[in-house]
Curated annotation (Swiss-Prot):
Cofactor: pyridoxal 5'-phosphate
InterPro entries, per the entry: AcOrn/SuccOrn_fam, Aminotrans_3, Aminotrans_3_PPA_site, Class-III_PLP-dep_AT, PyrdxlP-dep_Trfase, PyrdxlP-dep_Trfase_major, PyrdxlP-dep_Trfase_small
Name of protein: Acetylornithine aminotransferase
A GO term for molecular function: identical protein binding
Reactions it catalyzes: N(2)-acetyl-L-ornithine + 2-oxoglutarate = N-acetyl-L-glutamate 5-semialdehyde + L-glutamate
Cofactor: how bound: Binds 1 pyridoxal phosphate per subunit.
Organism (species): Listeria innocua serovar 6a (strain ATCC BAA-680 / CLIP 11262)
Residue numbers carrying N6-(pyridoxal phosphate)lysine: K235
Keywords on record: Amino-acid biosynthesis, Aminotransferase, Arginine biosynthesis, Cytoplasm, Pyridoxal phosphate, Transferase
Family recorded in the similarity comment: Belongs to the class-III pyridoxal-phosphate-dependent aminotransferase family. ArgD subfamily.
Intracellular or extracellular location(s): Cytoplasm
Subunit details: Homodimer.
Amino acid sequence: MKHVFPTYNRFPVDIVKGNGTVVKDATGKTYLDFTSGIAVCNLGHCPENVTEAIQSQLANIWHTSNLYECALQDSVAELITDGTDKLVFFCNSGTEANEAALKLARKYTGKEKIITFEKSFHGRTFGSMSATGQAKIHQGFGRLVPGFTYVPYNDIESFKTELDENTAAVMLEVIQGEGGVIPGNAAWLMEVQMLCKKAGALLIIDEVQTGLGRTGTLFGFQQTFLDPDIFTLAKGLGNGLPIGAMVGKEHLSSAFGPGSHGSTFGGNKLALAAAKEILLTMKQTGFLEEVNAKAAYFRNLLEEHFEQLENVVAIRGEGFLIGIELGSSAAPVVTELRDKGLLILTAGPNILRILPPLTVSYAEIDQAISILKSVLEKQLIGSE
């Protein structure tokens, strides 16, 4: 790619077509996509009902800006908040949603200090990059936005040491996806929430990767019955169309009046048409129950076939956000899997990250397990 900045280490594959879990490259080779576009295409590629909703909106109007009323924004916001005391700000991506959350927290509390966690990932714009607890993400960009403090994840004593009356907010992921697929301990998450309330700090949960059914509930924080002051969405909210959302408790709106924040494209009708259909699908009776059944089936097979392998250190995650920690580099495994027709990701040097569409079939799960088995067992033999 001669005319594009080299900001990505791209795989040598050009995906040109997709349907459900299956994608096809420019040479005609097909793959099982167990990346979902990095947890984006939760309903698979080109789901018929979402495609129809987009096509219908395309024929009417795409963009009007936020100068005008938008019934579609209100409709999607209602589906997200589902009768709770929350309001929504629409934007175009996860990093923008997190920027909005950080701005709201500081403006509402009048405080600057924000606690985040080591190995976290919240985005690459300056505010969300500053919130990210990874030095490699910060390198080369000069002075970060001040006021951020990073503490070890799942470590309540370190957290207690940093939390004080000057803390505006605490920002966390219930599963650190980019940081190695590290689930937050349920008791730790609950205690963090309790301590935030006691200190008067807002709790912000970054649901960009864990939201929209990925962990088996509509939002990942519902796994542990948390009640965040603010949470953020993107990725699966548009199933490939650019949309993000910052969701906050209604009383916070006193700090976010006209002129306090904005977005030219945020909440555009085309992305919202997709989001509405996606949310309606996920809220259908039995949808998430089926996701959980398939995820349990997949997890059982992973543990049955791979836990005993010498090179497999751990299998962890929730729902269809799964990490396999290896005793060696993950990159060669990902390459060989791709050659055999299975696309997965890494989450660090030795972590395989597996993110199939929520609509994956049992037969596709079986096929993926077969490919994984052939490659991981071969890697084990090769290391002996």
